[in-house]
């Protein structure tokens, strides 16, 4: 009986994890190559482990199945800690000092838009969609 409960809990946990946003931790060049191959845009999450709004987004937004599905269809997503070299460089280049900061790029590396700060899932997806829609008009 204990084995059955363990297997069921494991299966439920695996199902829940499938809906989450899958973030790459590879180099920015590798992420861009993945986006080119898949025909998707690049989404970058600049965060810090000590940042409460960053942790809230991870817990309440990026863990949701609807957000995960939305992001998976449109992006190769990556996340970089702003306390580490890649995150510091991206923050220096594209940020204004406040995190979380979300950057959306096309496959040529052109910045299409940025979202700064935490938001509720619906507002987050609307902000992302607005950037995507704006990029289609270019």
Regions found by a protein language model. Name each.
Residues 23-41, 71:
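A short beta-strand-turn-helix
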Residues 46-62:
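Conserved redox-active cysteine motifs that mediate thiol-disulfide chemistry
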